[in-house]
Amino acid sequence: MPPSTLRKRVIFTQGGKGGVAKTEVAVSLASWYSEQGIEPALLDLDIENSDKGGLRTFLPAAKPFDLHEHGTLDEFLSACDDGESPVVLADMGAGAGKATYDWFENAADIAAELGIQFTAIGVTTNEASSVQAILRWAEHLQDSVDYLIVLNEMRRPRCEFEYWHDEPRVQEFVRAFSPNVMRMDSRVEEFQAELRNQSLTLEQIAEGRVEDPFFRLTKNKVRAIRYQRTLFAGFDEARQILLP
């Protein structure tokens, strides 16, 4: 098979600022892929967070790896060899920056020659630190990846994201790399806390595949459907950088 026909895409969350809901985005993206008829190879590179809500907590099929072990990011490429899935979805942990930067500097061009494309997902709230984390990753990754930016309202419905829109360096980033930008709805705090406590996905609640009385309430099923639809609409808009 000629290298140019490999056609694989590796999607990974930027492991910068913690607590911005990057794992929730990855979990919902996996559900979106299922709707497209794709079952992505799943990598959990945030094993230090496994007891508190890493990818494998919600999606047990995710393979765990220690990002700080030498050669771990080569699993991006190993996963491209496994099975028939054209997509690899990896959730990175906080503090993943240096290892990722070094790997891309050494391997990204070669991977691209083999037909492997990359998409980096940056999730930000309306906090300067989470915005700066995205910009820091872009400084290192440059145009070796496509960018999907998720503006997470967190607990601020209809947030205007002034830190994102008013930061001059963000405007430079947008001009240089033309990222896809989408929004993530603010979630009711009790709903989100129980979602994480019980390691459930929006898909499970929306489809009624839960036993807990709290999540069988109609109001919470409606919430799950609404939150998921907003995310899916954003993924639909970005499908050209999410599919091979």
Spans of features found by a protein language model:
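P-loop NTP-binding site
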Residues: 148-156, 163-244
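Nucleotide-state-sensitive switch-loop elements of NTP-binding domains
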Residues: 3-12, 26, 35-100, 117
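Conserved lysine of the Walker
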Residues: 22
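Walker A (P-loop) phosphate-binding loop of P-loop NTPases
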Residues: 16-19
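Conserved catalytic-core segment of NTP-binding enzymes
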Residues: 95-194
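Exposed alpha-helical structural elements
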Residues: 72-75, 99, 106-109, 169, ...
